[in-house]
Every structure is written in structure tokens, then in C-alpha cells.
Amino acid sequence: MTKWLQTDDQVQNLSINEVGWVGVDKNAAEIQSLKQKLEQHNGITGLQVFEPDELEAIVDVFYRDGFVVVQNVLSADQLSVLKAACDEEVIKLLSKDKERSGNRGSHRYSFGSASRTGHMMHRPEWAMLLDLDTLTPIMSAIFGSSHYIARGGGGDFCLPGATKYQPLHSDMSNAVHHLHQGKTYTFGSFMDPRGILNYRDLPTPYVCCNFLVVDSNATNGPIRQIPGTQHSHHPMPKLDAEPDWMKHSTVNPAPAGSVIIRDVRAWHGGTPNLSNEVRAIPNVEFYAPWFRENLLTSVPRDIFESLSEHGQNVAKYIAAAEGQSLDIGYRNSLGGTPDGF
């Protein structure tokens, strides 16, 4: 759904943690009651947080649960520059949305959906995530090869005042063909013409790495992940039928500088941010060496040429050609909000 948005000429004058709670009374009784519930119940029991060199355990937990948390993936300097870039882009994006309508529900946004390239790889702070000394060995271990490729990178953020849950969802599907105005559009890439297998039966084809630029806690909108659902054929529960244990299956506590490595098929969703800080989780996304979907050009040539040899190999399918310029900026509609969000 696309909504007409009002611009916000004053957001530039606000600090990053003053941009939320627009049109929402954080002192309302129902908000305070929900906040208390989150403080009491949020957080996956026994959540393990690994160091980057614990490769065997990282891979085991990733394949068991469909996600894994690794701390100290970003150095202090890398964390600082990435957070500053996120803060800058949040302000730019909000300048188009005075009422904080969002593009993933009120006070909730996808960087990539808002971006005219579909990604944020035109920012060197995002591009550096393609080849981190701490992350590359993990991705090579998960895929069993260093020849995986980048899909791009964006991520999301939720503002203080995001009081609603995002429905559980998955970021993949079987191939779907849609006819529109005489043209056929294909979404997804895997289809078994025999009707025996579907994308959930495959080894991990597509991984998203979400980086924490602030500590993840019970009330600042931590992502919720339902362990072991990456291969599930059961229908995801609708939000109004979702049991409380799923709503509280949040990835917290986890420190800033960590990465949440996700098999995108696993059920996940956003949770309320009733804190006083913006929670952003910028990401990079990778495909297994054997998997492909349509790829969008999103890495400017000068940034591509600044990458390491491995970084260039990973990003070669999304890099601009020599002399090619990219249309960089945010859509006025911020990309619109998908149905159900």
C-alpha cells in the first residue's frame, strides 16, 4: 500500500533519539502496561552469543535454529562509523515522513525498500560489511565455500513509538508468476516442476546478516526469531493467533557490534520499540554459490574498486560497470508498505 506522505522540515534539528513518539503518548496506560510485559518476558531463554572464532558452534547453531548471534564482529571504529551512517540516513528518510507512517508499519522502516536502488551499498559504511575479517570465515563455513555472492544490503530500523508487532513472515518463497498489464513478472526462483520439493527443503540458499549498532534489549524493538522454522511447512500463525511465547522469542540481550546471521526462510518479525532510542539493524545479504535470484546493480564503481579481492568477487554481480551511474536517494513514497504490514 502506498500512502501520501508529508515532508518534515524540522527533523534535521532533532537528535537521533528525539525523532520518535510522533502522535503516540508514551505515558498512556496501555503503553506502559505493554512495556512492563516486554521487560518481564522478552528474550529467548538460553540465547547463545558466540565469538567470531567459534566457527563450529556458530555453524551448528545456525543450521539448528535458522539464526545465530555473534558478538565482536565489528571493531569499535567500524561500529562508530556504521552507526553514524545509519543515524544520518534515518534523518534523511524521516525528512520525507512527518507523521512517521513508515513503510513497514507506523514508526517502522526498511532502508532497502525506500532506496531507489533497492539497497544501501552506495554508502561505504554498508559496503565494508561485504568483507569483514570476522564475518567472511563464518560465511564461508556456513556455505561450505568462499564463492558465495552478495545480493546487496539495506536493513531496517524502528523508532521509539513503534507500538505494534510486525506479523511473522519469511523473506523467501517459491517462484510465483504474476501477470500485470500484459507482462509476466516472476518473484522467487526455485520451483520443482514435479511438485515434490519446495524452497524450504533446500540447504540454506540465502543468508541475511543484521548488525546491531545499539545494544538489543527487551524494549527497543528487538527482532523476534522462531527457532527451527527455516524448514517448516506449517503455516505461520496470523498475528492475532500468535502465541505469547512467539511474540517474546526476541533476540536479546545482545551487544552493539554483534551480528545476527539469519536463514531468511526462518519465521521472524518486528516487535514494539517502547524505549527512547532508535533501533537500526543494517544488513548485507548473501546467496549460496549455487543459488540465484534477480540481482539489482547497487554498488557504485568507485566503491567496488575500493573493496578487497574477496569483496570484489562477492560483489561482482551487483557492481556498476565502468562509467555507469546509479540513481541514488529515497523514493518519495518510501516504497510503500506491503499488504499485511
Label the model's feature ranges.
Residues 2-65, 71-189:
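Non-heme Fe(II)-dependent double-stranded beta-helix
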Residues 3-48, 231-243, 250, 259-261, ...:
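Non-heme Fe(II)/2-oxoglutarate
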Residues 69-71, 148-152, 208, 222-225, ...:
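A structural signal for short, well-ordered beta-strand segments and their strand-loop junctions
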Residues 74-76, 155-158, 173, 215-218, ...:
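Short, solvent-exposed loop/turn segments at secondary-structure junctions
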Residues 122-128, 196-198, 246-250, 269-271:
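Active-site rim elements
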Residues 153-155, 209-211, 282-286:
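A structural signal for short, well-ordered beta-strand segments
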Residues 164-251, 293-301:
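Catalytic core of non-heme Fe(II) oxygenases with the double-stranded beta-helix
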Residues 255-256:
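Residue-level recognition of short, solvent-exposed, well-ordered loop/turn junctions
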